[in-house]
Amino acid sequence: MRPEGLEPPAYWFEASRSIQLSYGRIASSYHPNEYRFTMAVETEIKLRLPLGAERARALLEQHGFHATGPRQLETDQTFDLPTGELRQSGRLLRLRSAGDRWIVTYKGPAAAGDRHKSREEIETGVSDGAAFAQILERLGYQPSFAYEKFRTTFKSPGEDGIATLDETPIGDFMELEGPGYWIDRTAQQLGFGPADYITSSYATLYEEHRRVHETVPRDMKFQSP
């Protein structure tokens, strides 16, 4: 029971009303000054796009998908304890800059034994990303890996998931996020099968890339010409 006269802050009620247990990200709807957050079970796969993002965009549009917003640069910074505890346990703590928005994300360990990657995801917007990063560092977390991508998000009316095109320094990828049945059906419609599914993170994919290209930088960022 709450002690008499002790009321939670007003934004707590707004946050409580905004909890959504659903598939799919709604981060694109965040405004940095809103105390809004989501809790969800994220289910997704990646697909490598050897023919490039433009060919994939045309393919999505042929199947009724439309971009929900402009192509946008996202800069992600993950944080971990000095021991690497989060990475070792399959968890992730990430601060994302996307346009004028800052988004903080926690992801839990992925469920084992599935061809899709399913994990708990909690997201919220913050108004000052630099200040939030300092708070994390004061709590003992340190920057662990940074990566960039140009992302375009697509949705088909009435469908249960979203598709994103990611143009990264190591190639172009498509992410399909939604219920497992929707992922499998959509991947098949686009010409992909389970053998094409990638459940690795961009951090893992970049580690594999660095083992072949030893001179590339530590972080996955676009290099100036």
Task: Say what each PLM segment does.
Residues 163-170:
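A contiguous pocket-lining binding segment that forms or flanks enzyme active sites
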Residues 27-36:
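N-terminal, intrinsically disordered charge-dense segments
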Residues 5, 18-21:
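Short, positively charged low-complexity motifs
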Residues 183-190:
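Internal alpha/beta scaffold segment
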Residues 39-160, 196-225:
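N-terminal strand-loop-strand beta-hairpin
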